[in-house]
């Protein structure tokens, strides 16, 4: 699918701790579980009168979003603020990049301002890896989504949602439905589910929206929604990403909904206590019926809540790991 994940050792320091968070590929189950456990411990912060812990006090987190995202940007801002960090969000449309400045120059200038961490969202696959390896090696880099490649914090918030509603992964059947081809969320979810021991991972979609070689993720492939949803515990619907499509991959959105839209009738094929998830934004009447999105099976708003806790966990763990790596390198340079 993509060679970018071959660079995964870059994410860990000499102790195996997180120092960047770029992809879920190759990260050990123990580390993913630690992220989930840490996020669980942060959930109660949102219920406090003063929603703050001092873990990143005195640190500066820069959100550098070259792609628009209300949900991801806002939850990263809230996560950093709840950790007591100073937060800067770069509006790329009004920044120097719109005047011809390169990604390299933009981030180098931010690094010179003594930022401690960058959360980067970019349309190009591999952008976060490039930044971590070549641009700002001493700054913790968090991937907020890069092209079709990865969206690791979305993957982890989805895992937290599943674990909190289902208790674990060992006996689950999970279906990921829709535009698999263009979805970095699908890739991150497949990697996370496999690493966490989910025995039955299914991808469902039209042949034109299924990536070549998707089977290498250890998934079962279905092109019939009713068949693929049979007896599943979790249904993860994906947004139809028209902005990334070229050519005639779909005859129409109406035809897609007719064959792959999740309706109350189709959801009946899943287990009675199945949960329905969606990374947002939702296209009602395209990939999901409003009655399902707003119904008793939906945990979509829970995903948003859990996203803040997951991002708090990742920010705090990556900052700690980067600090440990910096200290190790300084001691060995003497």
UniProtKB/Swiss-Prot annotation:
Keyword Transferase: yes
Catalytic reaction equation(s): carbamoyl phosphate + L-aspartate = N-carbamoyl-L-aspartate + phosphate + H(+)
Example of a GO biological process term: amino acid metabolic process
UniProt: carbamoyl phosphate binding residues: 71-72, 121, 151, 154, 280-281
Keyword annotations from UniProtKB, A to Z: Pyrimidine biosynthesis, Transferase
Keyword Iron-sulfur: no
Pfam families for this protein: OTCace, OTCace_N
A molecular function (GO) term: aspartate carbamoyltransferase activity
Pathway note: Pyrimidine metabolism; UMP biosynthesis via de novo pathway; (S)-dihydroorotate from bicarbonate: step 2/3
Gene Ontology CC annotations of this record: cytosol
Major enzyme class: transferase
Family the UniProt entry places it in: Belongs to the aspartate/ornithine carbamoyltransferase superfamily. ATCase family.
Function: Catalyzes the condensation of carbamoyl phosphate and aspartate to form carbamoyl aspartate and inorganic phosphate, the committed step in the de novo pyrimidine nucleotide biosynthesis pathway.
HAMAP family for this protein: Asp_carb_tr
Quaternary organization: Heterododecamer (2C3:3R2) of six catalytic PyrB chains organized as two trimers (C3), and six regulatory PyrI chains organized as three dimers (R2).
NCBIfam families, per the entry: asp_carb_tr, PRK00856.1
PANTHER family (alphabetical): ASPARTATE CARBAMOYLTRANSFERASE, ORNITHINE CARBAMOYLTRANSFERASE, MITOCHONDRIAL
Name of the protein this chain belongs to: Aspartate carbamoyltransferase catalytic subunit
Gene: pyrB
